[in-house]
From Swiss-Prot:
<dbReference type="GO" id="GO:0019904">
    <property type="term" value="F:protein domain specific binding"/>
</dbReference>
<dbReference type="GO" id="GO:0032991">
    <property type="term" value="C:protein-containing complex"/>
</dbReference>
<keyword id="KW-0547">Nucleotide-binding</keyword>
<keyword id="KW-1210">Necrosis</keyword>
<keyword id="KW-1271">Inflammasome</keyword>
<feature type="domain" description="NACHT">
    <location>
        <begin position="175"/>
        <end position="484"/>
    </location>
</feature>
<dbReference type="GO" id="GO:0050727">
    <property type="term" value="P:regulation of inflammatory response"/>
</dbReference>
<keyword id="KW-0378">Hydrolase</keyword>
<dbReference type="GO" id="GO:0007165">
    <property type="term" value="P:signal transduction"/>
</dbReference>
<dbReference type="GO" id="GO:0051245">
    <property type="term" value="P:negative regulation of cellular defense response"/>
</dbReference>
<feature type="region of interest" description="Disordered">
    <location>
        <begin position="71"/>
        <end position="91"/>
    </location>
</feature>
<dbReference type="GO" id="GO:1904784">
    <property type="term" value="P:NLRP1 inflammasome complex assembly"/>
</dbReference>
<dbReference type="InterPro" id="IPR001315">
    <property type="entry name" value="CARD"/>
</dbReference>
<feature type="compositionally biased region" description="Basic residues">
    <location>
        <begin position="77"/>
        <end position="87"/>
    </location>
</feature>
<dbReference type="GO" id="GO:0032495">
    <property type="term" value="P:response to muramyl dipeptide"/>
</dbReference>
<dbReference type="Pfam" id="PF13553">
    <property type="entry name" value="FIIND"/>
</dbReference>
<dbReference type="GO" id="GO:0072558">
    <property type="term" value="C:NLRP1 inflammasome complex"/>
</dbReference>
Length: 1218
């Protein structure tokens, strides 16, 4: 009892510091940090028990737990410091030099005298801080739940000293910093740390002369204040006269903590009507004027608020720095436990709760939950109970806290009254209560004293008011009040409806499931938790009424698809019946334009941005009850696979903790419908792989496909994988590429593959780095098991010297080289597709012909233009750019934009190093020269991971739109249509003519299409399948109109079917319209013409001559599926052949009439040198069939036998069909 009393007094002192109203883990654990450690042997005994509780591996007696924490969680700690910047050494510091102090601080919990110093960085409770990025000029069309700024790259992690650093885009120092985050995540803690750091001379001394901290819940108690009175309240001791303080407003910082808590509307007022700083005015008006910059416009502000409150609270605050608090890293969670319990070193306790720790560690990323858990453990120790931590949810933990702190059931009536007080305060947005408020509610004096003593309530000495220990605790009590209401009077469905209406009125439909009260309410409606409530309140609840209330809350119209808040609520509830019923009815596709704010325009694939371990845990938990068949946790740089629908893709930009991996894989033990899991690009530790393989061995796991590309796996992980393969009968496909498994690891995999229980049919791994012996083993396995296919498409795992940006030689890992060099099967394109830059043409490589994926390496800074595609890049340094040809139908289908916008150019999927490209010119085919199209109607559509964004280009030129400082994703130009104009948009078009010879008969195909390189390429490939060859002729000179029809005619009597062509846009994946023209004898040539059907004016004419045609090509044999990846001999040795063929004319003579037409023959011969002739010859070889290249090879053998023999010996074979 004495210790409890001491702790209550300590809590009171905490409340007095900086007007603290919430439970602050920083202050709760500071005592333990500052206390001298004595008797290391006894301490080690206690800490040994603690590490058992936390699931940490044992260590030798001479190693302190602080060191163990540092060593075992180095990766988590490293990440929490990855964005750390050096402090400005010019800061004025009153007590020593910060950089020296900071650098001396080790990544551990020191047991030395230094812990007694009051330097900030030695007693900070570290929080993960994410600075959000909101790209300017972007109009977000899609958001999941409400992410007011879904960053393209997730923002970046920062430290507390970076809060007021200049914006990366504008280089301007922010005047407004918004600290946002979930309930209990540590926003107020951070705000108080900033104030205390400034007071102690640790932060911002060079920028701010005065820092004022205000608790908005206390300010709301004041009806009117003058600016002078506000400043006086914001300082414990007034350091200067008000007039002097206000003389330099740019040196002032106002911290407004919990600005979303009071029920006020912050209204700005006309600057001309602003009163003098000594005159009083309504508080909400005063604060509104500060925010609106009507008064002290040069001053800086820091606000804290829950993320869900920002949208309606402050709709127009310009461009603030937005920083989201993500809670504790895993290291800091364990660190917190150590600090909290360090004072208990004289207590010997048996901990036996290892099994539930991963879930609890994940819940404890929220500092308030950390405090709650530690308080429960402490109460159990004080009461001599056997420690029991079976709680899987925050709701269960709160009930455990109540059962441990409420002294018997005699307080149940007063506890009900306290719940009513909490609910009334939540509805009225009140968190401070006077003594009379408590008495009016029915709380007795002795009950108030008891609640203060056990820490549920706390007194505010400055205002003589009371509050709950934390706002989350008040919201928990409010949730209990809704349960208790119905137990007193069975109101049935009407009571349920009234409860739901009250919740909607308080939180709004948009944010209903984000509200902690609603989450607690769903958690309390769990069967187990309701029984716990019955024990606490000594009553029985009407179960049927509770079930109806449950369904009315999660039912329509409030339930939003893929809403993170709903996932949280379902996780808190944990009822399998409700989870299955809700998730199986979960809409996975957009049902119309009204869902544009909540869904993504890609059917059957849902995308969610998750920022924390907690969000990952609740989402994966709920997914296992849904129809989702494929789950991807997107990592960086991973290869994309096509997922089986319905699918879900989760995006996260912060590392995943070990505890979270364990929880995620635990959820996979019973997957119901989930069959595919893609973790590629996410680093997996040894213990994470062990947890994954343990889950895969469970009978309830139905995963059939597992992608682990570039997950940092080593040979040490292969024993778990092999054991899983031997035991898991469902896994059919496993991808382990870009992992350093080595010979030993692959041998272990072979053992698993030999097991008769293994049903794996596809295994992908890197074979180039393996020894011949291991490769032989793999081939033997394939031979023995015909169903097993082992594939590899990546380069060798070797470390080779490369040159870094400073000109120094460095070692590049095999994985980096694979990402830089790509696939070993590369084909050089002809010069028609080259990028022309400062140093001349730069060749483009084919990475994957089937996927239309290409790569170009731009060697230096400058401007590069590709005439074939119309793309233009301006780069600041050497950079490799990947370009994929896409189809609009794949992305734009079934979106509202298909009715309001028209496609205006090709769609490209471009990837480049961030910051290397300062401008990109995207081609469009809308004709601006007609003067009928306003350039402001042009937009660039970005199809990003989290949805689609429309961006306004910097300028629009006749043939392209310019984006400056672009971010890349599938992107292309759209034109907003005006109803009055309709389809009468002038466009630039092209004609494509193809022919095929059969004896003397000729068949032509004539196309009229928009000038889109992706359409042209699709037509080229389709015609080549039927041995049609393109003839290049000039396009129409004038702009044409979509929907117009044109008559096809000829100067000779020929067969034309159909005789009309309509100019229309069709996706490259669709069949294009063409006219087929049959000519019996071309003679000296024919004229083809296109005439506008409506106005009968000639719009295009071309003369086709015999010299345009080549003899009939040999028929191509059917190639195997892997033929596109197989290079012909002449393509493999292109560079050698160009350099070493010394006699070209005899070679041309052998190709003349078989491969080369008369015109081609003369064109090649006209080049000046042998090298130029060979380059010209290879340029034309792009359209050759495999058989034509065989003819080329035979001609080379006859004219240059020694050269061919030399190349054959070096290559070990020849890729030809004989």
């Amino acid at each position: 009892m004495g210790e409890s009393q001491s702790k209550q007094e300590s809590n009171t002192r905490v409340a007095q510091h900086g007007s603290q109203q919430d439970v602050d883990p920083t202050f709760q654990t500071k005592r333990a940090l500052e206390r001298e450690r004595s008797s290391p042997q006894v301490e080690q005994s206690f800490l040994g028990q603690l590490q058992s509780l936390l699931g940490w591996s044992s260590t030798s007696k001479d190693v302190p737990l602080s060191q163990l924490i540092r060593e075992m969680d180095h990766e988590s700690r490293r990440h929490s410091h990855q964005s750390k910047k050096k402090l400005d050494r010019s800061e004025h510091i009153s007590e020593g030099t910060i950089p020296e102090i900071y650098e001396k601080r080790k990544e551990t919990i020191s047991h030395t005298q230094s812990m007694e110093q009051k330097y900030l960085f030695q007693n900070f409770t570290k929080l993960l801080l994410l600075q959000k990025c909101c790209p300017g000029g972007s109009e977000k069309l899609v958001r999941e739940s409400w992410h007011p700024c879904v960053p393209e790259e997730g923002g970046h992690m920062i430290e507390i000293q970076d809060l007021f650093d200049p914006n990366l885009d504008t280089e301007k120092k922010p005047q407004l910093v918004i600290i946002e985050g979930a309930a209990g995540i540590g926003k107020s803690t951070l705000a108080r740390q900033v104030k205390r750091a400034w007071e102690e001379g640790q932060l911002y001394r060079d920028r701010f002369q005065h820092v004022f901290f205000f608790s908005c819940r206390e300010l709301a108690q004041c009806k009117q204040l003058s600016l002078a009175e506000l400043i006086a309240q914001g300082q414990e001791v007034l350091t200067a006269p008000t007039r002097q303080i206000l003389s330099r407003p740019e040196k002032l910082l106002f911290i407004l903590d919990g600005i979303d808590e009071p029920a006020w509307v912050l209204e700005d007022q006309n600057p001309e009507l602003c009163v003098h700083w000594s005159q009083a005015q309504p508080v909400h008006t005063l604060l509104g004027s500060l925010l609106g910059k009507s008064i002290l416009p040069e001053a800086s502000l820091m606000l804290t608020a829950r993320t869900t409150a920002l949208q309606k609270l402050i709709p127009s605050l310009g461009q603030p720095h937005r920083v989201e608090v993500l809670g504790f890293s895993e290291f800091e969670r364990k660190d917190y436990f150590y600090k909290y319990f360090a004072k208990e070193r004289n207590t010997i306790i048996d901990f036996n709760l290892i099994g539930s720790i991963p879930v609890l560690l994940t819940l404890c990323e929220v500092p308030w939950v950390c405090w709650l858990l530690c308080t429960c453990l402490e109460k159990q120790m004080q009461q001599g109970e056997v420690l029991s931590l079976t709680s899987q949810t925050t709701t269960a933990l709160c009930l455990k806290y109540l059962s441990l702190t409420i002294p018997g059931q005699h307080l149940s009536t007063q506890l009900r009254t306290l719940c009513s007080l909490a609910a009334e305060g939540i509805c009225q947005r009140r968190t401070l209560f006077s003594k009379s408020d408590l008495c009016k509610q029915g709380l007795a004096e002795d009950a108030i004293a008891t609640f203060l003593k056990i820490g549920v309530l706390q007194r505010q000495p400055s205002s003589l008011s009371y509050s709950f220990a934390h706002l989350c605790l008040q919201e928990f009590f409010a949730a209990m009040s809704y349960i208790l209401e119905d137990s007193e009077e069975a109101r049935g469905d009407m009571g349920n409806d009234r409860t739901v209406e009250t919740l909607v009125e308080r939180y709004g439909r948009q944010n209903l499931f984000e509200a902690p009260t609603v989450r607690f309410l769903l958690g309390l409606l769990n069967t187990r938790e309701m029984r716990e409530m019955e024990n606490i309140f000594a009553c029985k609840f009407p179960w049927k009424t509770k079930l109806k209330l449950l369904r009315s809350i999660v039912g329509e119209p409030f339930c939003q698809p893929c809403h993170l808040g709903l996932f949280h609520c379902l996780y808190e509830n944990q009822e399998e019946e409700l989870l299955t019923e809700t998730m199986l009815c979960f809409p996975l596709t957009a049902s119309g334009p009204n869902h544009m704010e909540a869904t993504v325009f890609q059917t059957n694939v849902k995308r969610l941005v998750i920022q924390t371990d907690m969000e990952l845990m609740v989402v994966t938990f709920c997914i296992t009850f849904s129809h989702v068949r494929s789950l991807r946790l997107k990592g960086k740089g991973q290869q994309e696979y096509k997922l089986t629908a319905p699918a879900m893709v989760l995006y996260r930009w912060t590392p995943i903790s070990e505890a979270s991996w364990k929880v995620l894989f635990s959820n996979l033990k019973c997957t119901r419908n989930l069959e595919e899991l893609d973790l590629s690009g996410n680093p997996l530790s040894y213990s994470a792989v062990r947890s994954l393989c343990t889950a895969l061995r469970q009978p309830g796991c139905r995963l059939k496909t597992l992608w682990l590309v570039d997950c940092g796996l080593t040979s040490r992980c292969c024993s778990f994988l092999a054991s899983m393969l031997s035991a898991h009968s469902r896994l059919a496909e496993l991808d382990l590429r870009l992992n350093d498994l080595g010979d030993n690891g692959v041998r272990q995999l072979c053992e698993g593959l030999r097991n008769p229980a293994c049903n794996l049919s596809i295994l992908r791994l890197d074979q180039a780095s393996l020894s011949e012996q291991v490769i032989t083993e793999l081939r033997a396995l394939e031979t023995k098991n015909p169903k097993l296919f082992i594939s590899s498409t990546w380069m060798s795992h070797m470390t080779m010297p490369t040159e870094n940006t400073d000109g120094e030689e460095s070692l590049t890992s095999s994985k980096q080289q694979q990402q830089q060099s790509g696939d070993k099967h590369m084909e050089p394109l002809g010069t028609d597709d080259d990028f022309w830059g400062p140093s001349g043409p730069v060749s483009t490589e084919v990475v994957d012909r089937e996927r239309n994926l290409y790569r170009v390496r731009l060697p230096m800074a400058g401007s590069y233009h590709c005439p074939s595609t119309g793309l233009h890049f301006v780069v600041t340094r050497a950079v490799t750019i990947e370009i994929g040809f896409c189809a609009w139908s794949q992305f734009l289908h079934e979106t509202p934009l298909q009715h309001s916008h028209m496609v205006a150019g090709p769609l490209f999927d471009i990837k480049a190093e961030h910051g290397a490209v300062t401008a990109v010119c995207l081609p469009h085919f809308v004709s601006l020269q007609e003067g009928k199209v306003d350039s402001s109607l042009f937009h660039v559509a970005h199809f990003q991971d989290h949805g689609m964004v429309l961006e306004t280009p910097a300028r629009v030129e006749p043939h392209f739109a310019v984006l400056e400082n672009p971010s890349f994703s599938p992107m292309g130009v759209l034109l907003r249509m005006i109803p009055a104009v309709g389809h009468f948009i002038p466009i630039t078009s092209i004609t494509l003519i193809y022919y095929r010879l059969y004896l003397e008969d000729i068949t032509f195909h004539l196309y009229l299409v928009p000038n889109d390189c992706t359409i042209r390429k699709a037509i080229d490939e389709e015609e080549l399948k039927f041995q049609f060859v393109r003839i290049n002729k000039p396009p129409p000179v004038d702009a044409l109109y979509v929907g117009s029809r044109y008559i096809v005619s000829s100067s000779k009597e020929v067969e034309i079917l159909p005789k009309e062509l309509e100019l229309c846009y069709r996706s490259p994946r669709e069949s294009q319209l063409f006219s087929e023209i049959y000519v019996g004898n071309i003679g000296s040539g024919i004229n083809l013409q296109l005439t506008d059907k409506k106005y009968m004016n000639l719009i295009w004419e071309a003369l086709l001559k015999p010299g345009d045609l080549r003899p009939a090509l040999p028929r191509m044999a059917s190639a195997p599926k892997d033929a596109p990846a197989l290079l012909h001999f002449v393509d493999q040795h292109r560079e050698q052949l160009v350099a070493r063929v010394t006699s070209v004319d005899p070679l041309l003579d052998k190709l003349h009439g078989l491969v080369l037409s008369e015109e081609d023959y003369e064109t090649v011969r006209a080049e000046a040198t042998n090298q130029d002739k060979m380059r010209k010859l290879f340029r034309g070889s792009r359209s050759w069939s495999w058989d034509c290249k065989d003819h080329f090879y035979q001609a080379l053998k006859e004219t240059h036998p020694h050269l061919i023999m030399d190349l054959l010996e070096k290559s070990g074979g020849v890729s030809v069909r004989l």
